Amino acid sequence: MNILIDNRQDKVDAINLEELVEKVIKTVLEVEEVIDNVEVSVSFVDNEEIRKLNKYYRGIDKPTDVLSFPLAEFEDTYGEVEEIEEDSEEVQPIGDIVISLEKALEQSMEYGHSFEREVAYLTAHSMLHLLGYDHETEEERKIMREKEEEVMARLNIGR
């Protein structure tokens, strides 16, 4: 498994976040029983950079907390990356995650929990998007929320 983390901001201290993000990604893959020969890219940015990305890709000219850019194709069931053999040594990139640490810090204060908990949750949420989950309908939202809560519980990260 390759997890590439790039801190592209200097407004929020990112010390110790790499290890946390790696644990969350590995836990999501375990929960989803996804083979581990995948690659995920994570970028930490500030509100201005994520605002630009949000405007370009989603037409929304305001900062958001996290953006997910899936690269892999999925079958009808969640988390099953096509065209990868379990015994294959080929690493399959499944997507990119962009987290605004500035927004995550704001939200952690707003919601009354730790900054680390917010970053962990955003990472889990985004990973589930990379694995084919969405929250366009109430049923999809419920399924995705249950998965997020399972990941957070396995990591023993509460509110």
Curated annotation (Swiss-Prot):
GO terms assigned for molecular function: metalloendopeptidase activity; RNA endonuclease activity; zinc ion binding
Domain of life of the organism encoding this protein: Bacteria
One Gene Ontology cellular component annotation held by this UniProt entry: cytoplasm
Cofactor note: Binds 1 zinc ion.
Signal peptide extent: none
GO terms classed as biological process: rRNA processing
EC assignment: 3.1.-.-
Enzyme class: hydrolase
Cofactor: Zn(2+)
Stored InterPro entries: MetalPrtase_cat_dom_sf_prd (IPR023091), YbeY (IPR002036), YbeY_CS (IPR020549)
Keywords noted in UniProt: Cytoplasm, Endonuclease, Hydrolase, Metal-binding, Nuclease, Ribosome biogenesis, rRNA processing, Zinc
Binding site for Zn(2+): H125, H129, H135
Subcellular localization: Cytoplasm
Function statement: Single strand-specific metallo-endoribonuclease involved in late-stage 70S ribosome quality control and in maturation of the 3' terminus of the 16S rRNA.
UniProt similarity note: Belongs to the endoribonuclease YbeY family.
Protein name stated in the entry: Endoribonuclease YbeY
